[in-house]
Amino acid sequence: MPRALEPAEPILSAEGIPYSPRYDDVYHSTEGGLAQAAHVFLGGNGLPQAWAGQRQFVIVETGFGLGLNFLATWQAWRADPQRCGTLHFVSIEKHPFTREGLAQLHAGLDGLQPLAQALQAQWPLALPGLHRLAFDGGRVVLTLALGDIEQMLPRLAAGADAFYLDGFAPARNTEMWSPQVFRGLARLARPGARLATWAAAGFVRRGLKEVGFEVSRAPGFGGKWQMTVASFRPQWKARRHAPPLPAQWAERHAIVIGAGLAGCAVTERLAARGWRVTLFDGHDGPARQTSAHRAAAMHAHLSADDSLLSRLSRTGNQYALRAWAELAEAGHAVGWHGCGVLQIGEDEAEGEAQRAALAAMRLPEGFVRWMSAEEAAAAHHAGVPRGGLWFPQGGWVAPPDICSAQLAQAGAAVTARFGCRVAAIARVDGQWQALGQDGEVLASAPVLVLANAHEAQQLLPQQHWTMRRVRGQLTTLASAQVDALGGWPDCVVTGAGYLLPRTADGAGRVGSSYDADEGPLVEQPAVHAANLARLSGMLPRQADAVAAIDPATLSGYVGVRTVTHNRLPLVGQVPDEAAALAQAASLRGAHLRDLPRMPGLYAALAYGSRGLTWAALGAELLASQIEGEPLPLESDLADAMDPARLLLRALRHGHTG
C-alpha cells in the first residue's frame, strides 16, 4: 500500500532559494534554477539536438520539485524548429507542492509565466500514482509519478532517451541515489540513452557504470566544478524485456469495431496522434447499446489496502475528468455534472469499513472525505440513514454525449461506418481485414481494435477471456412522483443502488439491477420494484412515500453489461492463444511480456458498470502501447487489465487442456 503523500511547503532559504526543511537542502543552485536546467540537464543530454527530427522523445526525471527542468525543456522544445513530434516527460516526485505552492514559487519566472500557469492549471491533487497531463495539443506530455521512488520507478513502463537525475544531495536524500534506482534507470534506458546530473560523487558514477552506462565528467554549474554525464552502452546485448521503442507503422490507419464508450475513446486518442480511423458499428449511430443510457455516475473506489481496483479507479477517474475537460475546452458539449457523489454503506458495519479505509489512506479532502448524515441532509437534501464517503469530484453524465464529443474531436480523421456489422476479421499480408456478411472486405489496416463488448468473442473466440453478460435496469420516476416524495438529493447517492439528481424536467433516476442475462431484453416491473427498494434503503425517510409508487407504472432503461471474472476490463494487445498453448511447457514460468501476441490486434472490452472510469484511461493506454510511448499508468495496473492475464494463469498452473 502506498504511503500517504506529504506535500512540500513553499519555503525560501535566507538567499531566497526554494528550500526543503525535510531534507535541509535547496531545490536548485543559487545561480538560478532555469540556468541550472539549461546547463546540466539540457546541455548534459545534448538537447535540443538529440531530439531533432524524432517522432517522439522520452525524458525520465528523478525529482520533479518545482518543475523548472520540465518548464525549461518545454520552452526549449517550443523554440526548436527541429523539435521532435511528441515530447514525453516522465517525472517521479515523493513530496509534490500544492497548486498554490507552485504558483507562489513560480511567481518570479517572468519569461515562463504562460507555461508555468498552464502547468498550475492542470496540477493534480496529491494522489499516489501516475497523472498524465497534456499540453500544446498533446505534443508535450507530462506524466507525474507521485510516490516513493522505490515504488514508482519499478512500476514505470517506458523507454527513455534521456535521464535527468535531480534529487536532493545524496547525503540528505539517499533513496534517490541507490543501486536500486540505478538499476531501475537501466531497465528503462533505450540503446544509447543519455543521462545527466549535477552530482559528481564517486559512488554515483560507479553505480551508473555498474548497470551499463558509460560515465564521464563534465564542467559543473555554479559553484560545482564537475557534473556527471553518461550514455547507456552496456557490455551485455540481450535484455529479457527491453524497453519499448517508438513504433514504426508503415500506415497509421486503424480499424475500431464498436462505437460505445470504449470504441469512441480509442478513436479520439488515435486521431489525436495523427491516425486515420475507420469505425464500425452495426447500429445507426454511436452509443446505441450498453453506452446508450443517459444516467451514468462516476466516482472512485476506496479500500484500506489500496487494492488494484482502488488504484485503477483513482487513476481512471482523474484521467477521465482531465480528458473531458479538454473536450469541453475544445467546444464540445460533454454534459458532465460535477455535483459530487455520496457513497453510503449498506449497513453500519460497511460504514465503519469506509471510515477505516479513509483513515488508512489519508487522501486529500479534495478527493474524498467523510460526510455525516446531518451534513448530507443540510448541504444536499439527502436524507440518508448514515454518513458516508464524499467524493467532491464525482458526478454523472450521459455516455452518448461523451461519445459524440469524442467523435466530433476526432473530426475528419474518422470514417464512421454506422449500420455496418463486421461479421469476421482476418489478417492477410500484414493487414487486418474487417469482413462483411458475404466475406467482402469492408476495410483493411495494420491495426484493429476490438471494442464491441461480448460480440468480440464471435469475431475472435478466446477461451481465457471469461466474459459474461450482466443485465442492468434503471428506473425513472416522473416529476410528480419525485415531488410526492417530499425531497430529493442534489448530488449522486450510492449504496445498495444509486440515485441521480433530478433532470431538467424534474425526473429522478434510480438504479440499478445486476442480474444474469436471461430472457428478452425488456423492462420488468419486478426489477423496478427492486430499484424502489434500493431507493428506500438510501432514503429511508421517504420509504412510505416510495411504497405508494406502483412499479407497473414505471419506465426506464434496460441494457447489458459485459464483465470479466474479477470485473476488471480487458485492455491491451490480444494474446496469440494458439501459439502460447503450443509452447505451454516453455511458458510455464512466463511473464505477461513473454507471451506471444497477435500483431496489430488490440482489445478494449468488458468495461462493465465502470465504463466512465475505464474508457478514457483504457484508450490512452492502448494508444500509448500502439505508439511505443510511456504508459499512463503503473505497469502492474496495466498487467491487471491485460487481455492475456488469465491465459498466463492457465499456463503457470498447467491448465492448458
From Swiss-Prot:
Residues 257-657 are annotated as: FAD-dependent cmnm(5)s(2)U34 oxidoreductase. Its EC number is 2.1.1.61, 1.5.-.-. Keywords: Cytoplasm, FAD, Flavoprotein, Methyltransferase, Multifunctional enzyme, Oxidoreductase, S-adenosyl-L-methionine, Transferase, tRNA processing. Its cofactor is FAD. GO terms for molecular function: flavin adenine dinucleotide binding; oxidoreductase activity, acting on the CH-NH group of donors; tRNA (5-methylaminomethyl-2-thiouridylate)(34)-methyltransferase activity. InterPro entries: FAD-dep_OxRdtase, FAD/NAD-bd_sf, MnmC-like_methylTransf, SAM-dependent_MTases_sf, tRNA_MAMT_biosynth_bifunc_MnmC, tRNA_MNMC2, tRNA_S-uridine_synth_MnmC_C. One of its GO terms (biological process) is tRNA wobble base modification. Catalyzes the last two steps in the biosynthesis of 5-methylaminomethyl-2-thiouridine (mnm(5)s(2)U) at the wobble position (U34) in tRNA. Catalyzes the FAD-dependent demodification of cmnm(5)s(2)U34 to nm(5)s(2)U34, followed by the transfer of a methyl group from S-adenosyl-L-methionine to nm(5)s(2)U34, to form mnm(5)s(2)U34. In the N-terminal section; belongs to the methyltransferase superfamily. tRNA (mnm(5)s(2)U34)-methyltransferase family. This is tRNA 5-methylaminomethyl-2-thiouridine biosynthesis bifunctional protein MnmC. It comes from Cupriavidus necator (strain ATCC 17699 / DSM 428 / KCTC 22496 / NCIMB 10442 / H16 / Stanier 337) (Ralstonia eutropha). The lineage of its organism: Bacteria, Pseudomonadati, Pseudomonadota, Betaproteobacteria, Burkholderiales.
